[in-house]
C-alpha cells in the first residue's frame, strides 16, 4: 500500500534536464496563447472578414461593391470586378412613392402600430431609420417577356444560382409554358448572386439565360436572409414589365406545383380576373420565434407585437397581378424582415387586404404529401422534391390524370395482392 501511494500521490524528484524541458513546454504554450490573442485582435478590426459582417444587424442589405453595369436593363451586363469583395451597404434614405389608391397609414391595422414605430426608432439609432430604397441593379433581365405575349399567369420561382438541375426539371414539368392549351404561362426564375463568388457558375447562368430567357438576377447576395429582397425583386419586375397580368404565383424551386389544377380549378380563366386577391396556405395566429438559435428568430426590437398578421406560407401563394405594385410600393415604408412570407403578410395588413382561404384547405401544402396520382390531381403544392423525383412523379401524374383516382385504386389493389402472394 505504501508503495502504491508513493507511485501515484507523490512527485518524484525531478532532474535538471526534466525541469528545463518542462519550462520550455510551458513557455511555448504561453507564447502560443499570446500569438493567438494578438491575431484575434488584428482580425477583429478588419471589415473584409466574411464573419465580421454577419447577417444579424442588417440582414438584408448585403451586396457586391465594385459592380459596374453598362446598361441596367440589358440581359448581360459587364461582370468585371464583380467577384472582388463583399461589403455591407447601408440603405439610403428615400421618400416612398405612395399610390393614390393606397392608404399607407398603419392606424387601425392590428399589431402593426407598435411594430412600425419601433422600427422607426431603431432605424434612427442605426442610421437606417427611413423608408427603404430599392437600388439593386439587374445583371440579367427579361423586360420584353410580356410584350411578346399576354400571359394569364406568371410563375415567380425563387431559386438558388447553383440549382441548375432544379430549374431544368421545372422547365420539363410544372413550369412548362405550353402546359395548358390556350392559356399563356410565363416562367421566371428569381436569382441573386452566388455567395461562393463562383465566376464559372455565373457564366453558366448567363448561358442558361441566353438559351431559355426565363431568369432575372440582381446584384444582392443570394442567401436565406435575402429572400425578402428576392421576392420584392419579383414583385417589382411584374409591376414594371407585366402590369396587366391577371395572376401571379410565387413559389420555390423544391416544390411540386399542379399548374393545371391551379389554373382550371382556382383561377378559372373563363371568369373575370379578381382584384386585391391573395391566397395560399394561411398561417393564422403565429407568434414570433424568440429563440435566438432558430433561423426563424425575430428580435423583439424588430417586431415587438405578440402575433404576426395573417400570412401565407412562402412555399407557394397566388395573388392578383394588381397587388404586385401595391405590395412593392408599401414595402418601401416597412423595414425588411428576413422572414419573407411574414413580411409580405405585414405589407398586406398595411394595405388592409386580408388573404383569403382557398376553396379546399388541402390544396396548398407546405410539407411533402405522400404521392398518389389521386391526391396529386387535387392539390396545388407539395414541398421538398429533388429534381429527379419531380420528373418521376410529374410524368406518372400526366399518364394517369384523366382517371387518377381510379388508377390509384387499381395500383393500391395490385400492391395488396402482391404482398398477399408473397
Swiss-Prot record:
* Its membrane topology: Single-pass type II membrane protein
Per the record, the pathway is: Protein modification; protein glycosylation
**Gene Ontology BP annotations:** lipid metabolic process; protein O-linked glycosylation
Enumerate the Cytoplasmic topological stretches: 1-24
The record's subcellular location field reads: Golgi apparatus membrane
Q: What is its EC number?
A: 2.4.1.86
Residues assigned to the Lumenal compartment are 46-422
- What is the required cofactor set for this protein? Mn(2+)
Main localization (coarse): Golgi
Please provide the record's keywords in A-Z order. Answer: Glycoprotein, Glycosyltransferase, Golgi apparatus, Lipid metabolism, Manganese, Membrane, Signal-anchor, Transferase, Transmembrane, Transmembrane helix
What catalytic activity does the UniProt entry give for this protein?
an N-acetyl-beta-D-glucosaminyl derivative + UDP-alpha-D-galactose = a beta-D-galactosyl-(1->3)-N-acetyl-beta-D-glucosaminyl derivative + UDP + H(+); a beta-D-GlcNAc-(1->3)-beta-D-Gal-(1->4)-beta-D-Glc-(1<->1)-Cer(d18:1(4E)) + UDP-alpha-D-galactose = a beta-D-Gal-(1->3)-beta-D-GlcNAc-(1->3)-beta-D-Gal-(1->4)-beta-D-Glc-(1<->1')-Cer(d18:1(4E)) + UDP + H(+); a neolactoside IV(3)-beta-GlcNAc-nLc4Cer(d18:1(4E)) + UDP-alpha-D-galactose = a neolactoside IV(3)-beta-[Gal-beta-(1->3)-GlcNAc]-nLc4Cer(d18:1(4E)) + UDP + H(+)
In this chain, the stretch annotated as Disordered covers: 90-110
Would the keyword Ubl conjugation turn up in this protein's UniProt record? no
**Function according to Swiss-Prot or TrEMBL:** Beta-1,3-galactosyltransferase that transfers galactose from UDP-galactose to substrates with a terminal beta-N-acetylglucosamine (beta-GlcNAc) residue. Can also utilize substrates with a terminal galactose residue, albeit with lower efficiency. Involved in the biosynthesis of the carbohydrate moieties of glycolipids and glycoproteins. Inactive towards substrates with terminal alpha-N-acetylglucosamine (alpha-GlcNAc) or alpha-N-acetylgalactosamine (alpha-GalNAc) residues.
Q: What is this protein called?
A: Beta-1,3-galactosyltransferase 2
Cite the source lineage. Answer: Eukaryota, Metazoa, Chordata, Craniata, Vertebrata
Amino acid at each position: 500500500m505504501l508503495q502504491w501511494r508513493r507511485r501515484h500521490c507523490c512527485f518524484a524528484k525531478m532532474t535538471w534536464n526534466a525541469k528545463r524541458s518542462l519550462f520550455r513546454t510551458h513557455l511555448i504554450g504561453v507564447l502560443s496563447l499570446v500569438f493567438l490573442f494578438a491575431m484575434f485582435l488584428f482580425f477583429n478590426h478588419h471589415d473584409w472578414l466574411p464573419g465580421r459582417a454577419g447577417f444579424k444587424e442588417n440582414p438584408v442589405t448585403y451586396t457586391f461593391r465594385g459592380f459596374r453595369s453598362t446598361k441596367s436593363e440589358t440581359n448581360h451586363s459587364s461582370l468585371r470586378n464583380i467577384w472582388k469583395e463583399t461589403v455591407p451597404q447601408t440603405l439610403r434614405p428615400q421618400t416612398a412613392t405612395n399610390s393614390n389608391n393606397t392608404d399607407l397609414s398603419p392606424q387601425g391595422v392590428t399589431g402593426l402600430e407598435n411594430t412600425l414605430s419601433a422600427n422607426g426608432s431603431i432605424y434612427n439609432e442605426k442610421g437606417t431609420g427611413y423608408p427603404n430604397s430599392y437600388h439593386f441593379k439587374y445583371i440579367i433581365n427579361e423586360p420584353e417577356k410580356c410584350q411578346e405575349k399576354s400571359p394569364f399567369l406568371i410563375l415567380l420561382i425563387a431559386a438558388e444560382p447553383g440549382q441548375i438541375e432544379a430549374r431544368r426539371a421545372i422547365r420539363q414539368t410544372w413550369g412548362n409554358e405550353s402546359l395548358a392549351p390556350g392559356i399563356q404561362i410565363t416562367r421566371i426564375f428569381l436569382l441573386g448572386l452566388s455567395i461562393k463568388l463562383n465566376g464559372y457558375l455565373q457564366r453558366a447562368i448567363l448561358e442558361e439565360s441566353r438559351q431559355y430567357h426565363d431568369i432575372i438576377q440582381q446584384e444582392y447576395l443570394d442567401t436565406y436572409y435575402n429572400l425578402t429582397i428576392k421576392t420584392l425583386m419579383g414583385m417589382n419586375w411584374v409591376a414594371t414589365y407585366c402590369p396587366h397580368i391577371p395572376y401571379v404565383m410565387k413559389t420555390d424551386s423544391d416544390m411540386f406545383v399542379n399548374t393545371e389544377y391551379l389554373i382550371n380549378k382556382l383561377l378559372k380563366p373563363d371568369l373575370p380576373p379578381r382584384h386585391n386577391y391573395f391566397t395560399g396556405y394561411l398561417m393564422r395566429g403565429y407568434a414570433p420565434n424568440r429563440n435566438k438559435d432558430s433561423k426563424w428568430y425575430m428580435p423583439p426590437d424588430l417586431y415587438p407585437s405578440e402575433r404576426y398578421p395573417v400570412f401565407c406560407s412562402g412555399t407557394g401563394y397566388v395573388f392578383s397581378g394588381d397587388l404586385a405594385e401595391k405590395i412593392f410600393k408599401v414595402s418601401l415604408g416597412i423595414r425588411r424582415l428576413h422572414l419573407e412570407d411574414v413580411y409580405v403578410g405585414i405589407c398586406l395588413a398595411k394595405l388592409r387586404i386580408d388573404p383569403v382561404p382557398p376553396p379546399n384547405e388541402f390544396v396548398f401544402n407546405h410539407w411533402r404529401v405522400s404521392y398518389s396520382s389521386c391526391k396529386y390531381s387535387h392539390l396545388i403544392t407539395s414541398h421538398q422534391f429533388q429534381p429527379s423525383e419531380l420528373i418521376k412523379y410529374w410524368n406518372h401524374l400526366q399518364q394517369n390524370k384523366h382517371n387518377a383516382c381510379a388508377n390509384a385504386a387499381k395500383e393500391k389493389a395490385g400492391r395488396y395482392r402482391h404482398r398477399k402472394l408473397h
